[in-house]
Every structure is written in C-alpha cells, then in structure tokens.
Amino acid sequence: MNIVHQLTWRHLKANKRRTLVTICGTIVSVAMITAVLIIMASFMQTFQKTVAAETGDWQVRFVEVRADQVPKVAQDENTAAYTVAHFEGWAQLKGSADPRRQAMLLTGYTPESFAQLPMTMIEGVYPRNDHELLVSQNFIDTARLDWQVGETISLSKGGYLLTDDGTDTWLDKADGRVAQAKWQFKEERTYTIVGIAKMSSELEGNWQDGYLGLCGMELNALSADE
C-alpha cells in the first residue's frame, strides 16, 4: 500500500461521519442516475410503440417504386421486413350517409403486409386477392351501408381527374380535392367483404374526403412499370 492509500485510509477513519455521508451520497447519486436512465429507456419504448400503433410498424418508406424495383429493396441487407402497397383506384359509394365521403380509395397490399399496418382486426380475415375487401369500423358506423362480412357487393370503379390551370391530375389520395375532381368510370367490379378493422387516424382519418378499402394483391400480377 503506497503513501497515498495510507493517507486516504487514515483520513477516512478519522472522519467517519464525513465518510459515511460521502458513501450515502454516492449511493443516492448512482441510484438517481440509474433511475433517470431507466425512465428514459422506458419512455422511448413507450413512444416507439405509440408511433408504431398510429403509423405502422416501419422505419423507412419508399414512394413511386416500380414493381420491378421491389426485389432490390427486399433483398437489401438492411431490410428486415417490408410491405408493398399499390393504388387500385376509386369506388363510388352510392347511398353513403356521410355527404363528404361518397367514395372509397382502394389500395392493394401483399398478404404479408397487413400485419404491419396500424389497425386492429375486429371481424373476419385479411384479404387474399383483389376481389376481397377489408373496410374500417369507422366506415361501417358512418357510411351506414349495412355491409356485412361475407357479403358480395358491386362497386363502380374508376378514378377522379382534377384539372387545375390546364394541368390534369389523377387523384390517388383522399386529401380534400375529390369534390373538385371529375369522376371517370372504368368498370363495375364485384368484391367480397372479408374483414372489418379498427384503423388508426393515420391510415384512415376523419378529415379525409374518402374512405379506405384494402384489397389483397400479388406482386407478380403487376406490370414492371406499375
């Protein structure tokens, strides 16, 4: 034991009260720092779960990706899981009780994608193909069309064309411009209602001027440039 250790030990024994206070203070400080770190970690986990529940379980989003580019993203070493969504068009909702929402935005997802979406299944199953449809509980409650799981319905499918300053734009979002756009009929399509889900406001918000309908989709059914 060198001279420094000897002097330190001598002073510790000579000032027992001060030594005890110092030890207690150190213990309390370490405990407080540990508690703060634990609280911060818990808060971050809670925040992450809240965001995932509201927006979906994902970290990065790529938009306007062609079908032939999806494998490149899926096979990247940084990709743990992925979802694929495709805008399928619009369907008019004749008889909807909500005067502001008279159409449904149809979006197709690959079967493995539905589990990543911010929604909770209430009844039924996920769609498996583009003739099966999943709707929100909000739609059931507000549109009041009395759609039931297992029911087959026929919808007028098409798109909304917005002309602004001589520029034509096909709407692919329910962003408040549907009422100003012109309906373009494409085909009459038959769907089977296979599920009802509680969707987060991020997926289907009450501020939107259209409901959301989710269909099944097979990636290999899309053309390379879709």
What are these regions (language model features)?
Residues 1-31, 44:
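N-terminal Sec/SRP start-transfer signal
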Residues 3-7, 38, 188:
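Charged, alpha-helix-enriched surfaces in structured cytosolic catalytic cores
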Residues 34, 38-42:
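Transmembrane alpha-helix boundary/anchor motif
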Residues 41, 45-226:
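Basic-flanked hydrophobic alpha-helices used for secretion and membrane insertion
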